[in-house]
């Protein structure tokens, strides 16, 4: 069984992440989405909320095959968690050349520490290349429409979260 390991903070999951996730299901029998937990990183959505978002998207994508998706957390080296779950390869999404430069460095380091784990790069679609979680949060915080950038359930959650912050 081929197991893809796709790690990130997913705060929130964007349509760019969704592009990559769709590619994962083409390449692997099972996809492990690993949400990195860092004590020094403040997130907008809790771990549980992010798990719910990703799980719902998985159900929407896969229907009865949603058992092909597993969502979990990690707070150690990505390669350690990937080994723990029996991953066949690591997945990294690319938006542009800047991402490629950074991800090539990471793939090199991971390859030295875990030569059995190959890194597979999946490019975002043209429509997903400009999307970042940071920009989505900024747009939502100012009351902007984020529906072109995130799944509808996440757009609603962002709207609700920032509406309460703004006191509306």
Swiss-Prot record:
It comes from Bartonella tribocorum (strain CIP 105476 / IBS 506). The keyword Transferase applies. It is found in: Cytoplasm. Keywords: ATP-binding, Coenzyme A biosynthesis, Cytoplasm, Magnesium, Nucleotide-binding, Nucleotidyltransferase, Transferase. This is Phosphopantetheine adenylyltransferase. Reversibly transfers an adenylyl group from ATP to 4'-phosphopantetheine, yielding dephospho-CoA (dPCoA) and pyrophosphate. Pathway: Cofactor biosynthesis; coenzyme A biosynthesis; CoA from (R)-pantothenate: step 4/5. Its EC number is 2.7.7.3. GO terms for molecular function: ATP binding; pantetheine-phosphate adenylyltransferase activity. Its cofactor is Mg(2+). ATP binds at residues 9-10, 17, 93-95, 103, 128-134.
